[in-house]
Amino acid sequence: NAIGYFHQRIFQYIAGCKVPENGNDGGWDIIYTNKNGIKLPDETVIHKIYVEMKNKHNTMNSAATGKTMIKMQNQLINDDDCACFLVEVIAQKSQNINWGVTVDKKKISHKLIRRVSIDKFYSLITGDDYAFYKICNMLPKIIKEIIDNQEKQIIPNDTVIKELKEMTRNLKINIEDLAIQTAIFMLGFGNYKGFEKNLG
């Protein structure tokens, strides 16, 4: 959760991004505005993106998925110069695609409702294909603090640190903290821009 919170809050320091307080501005996690226009992959140009952010691609059940889709459809009805993104920190792959879901047994989608991996979102809002990779390279100190604090706490059924340490045994890096950081990146971001050439 700390890493997810970090990923959401850091956007307040990126030009054009607003991170509303909980429940404000329609409950969106991030609102990105660019008066010069934002070009989507299909060449559509809009000026605002409303973002629902999820830490991992498989964290929404069908009810939450349907609710999110309806929220996005309602936003498009109220603002025809926007797009709505489901941004996933750990997506199945690097992507910026139309998001289609089944609601009430009907498959629905809209070209302005998109499922986007975080690397593609950073690229879109910064103009730098490697922006997410660069930010992640600044994270070692934060990750070390999280790991140090995690090991001091007793949390039932939490096997993430144990699994990461097991992954590091397969890496040929002697420094455990660096190996854990690399394992985290491999686990979640192996096919994102910048990571694929450095971790593959």
List the model feature ranges, each with a label.
Residues 22, 41-42, 74-78:
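Short, conserved, surface-exposed binding loops centered on an aromatic residue
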Residues 1-23:
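Acidic-basic catalytic patches of nuclease active cores, encompassing PD-(D/E)XK
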Residues 23-28, 64:
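Basic, glycine-/proline-tolerant helical and adjacent loop/strand elements
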Residues 17, 82-84, 136:
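Generic recognition of cysteine residues
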Residues 26, 45-46, 79-81:
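Short, well-ordered loop/turn elements at secondary-structure boundaries
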Residues 55-123:
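Catalytic cores of nucleic-acid endonucleases
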